[in-house]
Amino acid sequence: FGRVRVLYGARSPADRLFIDELESWKARDDVDLAVTVDYADGGWRGRVGFVTALLPHIRFDPDATLAMMCGPEAMMRAVASGLTGRGVPAGDVYLSMERNMKCGVGTCGHCQFGPVFVCKDGPVFTFAEIQELLAVREI
């Protein structure tokens, strides 16, 4: 890897996870960390807004970028669209999908996402693999 850029969003300052790890990443020379919260209280001194608002502020070479994300599906869809809109190939953008999994082998259908099963075909997919599925409201 060259530089690692972490865009981290949480609903509120109290909802942030891995605070010690975030602090250690912030101290590293090879990691750029940007943290934002959707809603802030009076003691918060950081950025306020959705994680997608961080995208225009980072510089990267689209052909040398690999993106990995987890979180709410709407956020991942928006960030993935923002990255591909800036030239990152959809096959280099990875999303960790979450579904209610029961059997874990694709039999029960609880985790079915269009034609794929998150339990056996994922849970990590490239944006290229599921971009069209993410646009369908019913799934």
Task: List where the protein language model places each region.
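Short acidic, gly/pro-rich beta-turn/loop elements at beta-sheet edges
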Residues: 16, 105, 129
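FNR/FR-type flavoprotein reductase catalytic core
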Residues: 1-102
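Non-heme iron-sulfur electron-transfer modules
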Residues: 114-139
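Local cysteine-cluster metal-coordination motifs and their immediate loop/turn environment
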Residues: 73-75, 98-123
